[in-house]
Amino acid sequence: MKGNTPYLVVNDLKKHYGDGEARIQVLSGITTTVNRGEVCVMLGPSGSGKSTFLNLIGGLENADGGTVSVGGCELTSLSSKDLGEYRRRELGFVFQFYNLGPDLTIKENIEVTAHLSANPLPMEDLLRSLGLWEHRNKFPRQVSGGQQQRCAIGRALVKNPGLILCDEPTGALDYKTSKEVLELMERVNREYGCTIVIVTHNAAIARMANRVLRLRDGRLAEDEVNESPVSASELDW
């Protein structure tokens, strides 16, 4: 359920790559808060630091400075071992490229992550919700790109996570399939109450968000609440 309860809290987050003359400051003190149950879209051109931001809040990279808290747990203070366990148990990830196991069926690809949770979602209910029940025994190469992305979303969702992080989830899809995936993510947010952060270069997607962040040269240029988000079915680009 959406509300005013802070769920993802980022404070003064910094990251650079390289040293000396090769040093590149990718993020320069990002501070923002995303409330529980919100859909947050982060926009910005290529090279603005969007994917790095997502990797840092998901614990896939280490920050140079600042803090990240999810559901009251400060991830940046955890040991590598504890962070890895928290990430596998509590966070869901959806990437542009699906990285599905080619020799596993659609159902088996989702089951791989189900055991990481003490409270996984019922498999049949999830597969039916994703529109994958009829394809559950097929291999990824036997289904469309949109169905593969649905499987990737299911793999993230089956753990029943509080936070799902999506890096260009429609970047490799055509317009029609992109709309279908966004409608699915909207339904996932509504039915399961998870907080979703979507990183994208497609500004039209921001219209479905409760909160819109815009990165420019590693800095947070905009942090706005969208008072009137539209349904994903109404998006056009």
Where are these regions (language model features)?
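ABC family nucleotide-binding domain
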Residues: 6-8, 13-209, 214-215
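Conserved beta-strand-loop-alpha-helix hinge in the C-terminal portion
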Residues: 219-237
